[in-house]
Amino acid sequence: MKVDLRKIRCRCCAALVFLAGSFSASHAGPPFVTDDPEPVELGHWEVYGFGAGTQVKGDIGGTLVGTEVNYGAAPNLQLHVIVPLAYDSPSGGPFVAGPGDIELGAKYRFVTPGEDDWYPQVGIFPLIEVPAGNAARGLGAGKMRAYMTVWLQKDWGDWTSYGGGGYWINPGPGNQNYWFVGWLLQNQVTKQLALGAEIFHQTADMIGGKDKTSFNVGGIYDFNENYHLLFSGGRGLQNPALTNQFSYYLAIQWTH
C-alpha cells in the first residue's frame, strides 16, 4: 500500500495547530490566554462573539467565529460554555471549517479579600471539552479532555495582576497530559481603555512534542456599559515554528 506522506504531514500539522489554537479561543480570560479567579456577578451575563487562531509552520487554524457565554449562577460561582465554528487551513491543503469542540466549565472563587487586604483573590475553574469537532479534518481533539486550574488576582489602583495554571487530561493516540502556567499585568489607561501583557508556558501536549513559551499583548475598550471590544495578538518565544508563529483574538462582548 502506498503511503501518502503529504496527507500524513497535513494531519500532523492540523493536530499541532488545533492544540496550539485551542488556547487562543478558550481556557482564558478574554482577550488573553491566562485566566483570572473573578466570576461574573450573581444574575449577570457575559456574551462574546469572537474569532481566534494560531499560525504554525505549514498551517493556521482556530475559531472562525464562536460564542462564549458566562452566567453568574450563585455568589462566587460562574457557569461557562463556548460553542465554536472551527477552521483549519494547511499549506498545500484545502481550507476546512465546521463545528469545533464544545467547552463547558464552572468558575468558583473561594477567597474574596476586601479592598484593604494584602492577600489575593483565589479561585478554581475546572473545564471539560466535548469532542464535537471532526478531528480528522483538524477541527477537534477527537476525545473528551479535561482541565483543572487555580487562579489568583490582586488589584491596586489602576493596575491588575493575575495568573496561575493547571493540568490538562489529554487522551488520544500520540497525545499526553500537560501543564500550563501563565501571568498577566494590566493597566486601566483611561476610563474606557485597559491594556495588558501576558507570558505563559505549556509543556508538550504530544509525545515527542515541544514545550512552548509565548506572550500576548492586548486590551479592552468599553464603548459603553454594555458593549466592549477585546483584542490581543502575540507569538511564541520557544519553538515558535511548531507552537506559535502568530496568534490573535478579537471579540465583541455584551455584558448585563
Region locations from a protein language model:
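Bacterial N-terminal signal peptides that target proteins for export
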Residues: 2-13
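Bacterial N-terminal signal peptides
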Residues: 11-22
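Transmembrane beta-barrel domains of Gram-negative outer membranes and organellar outer membranes
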Residues: 27-256
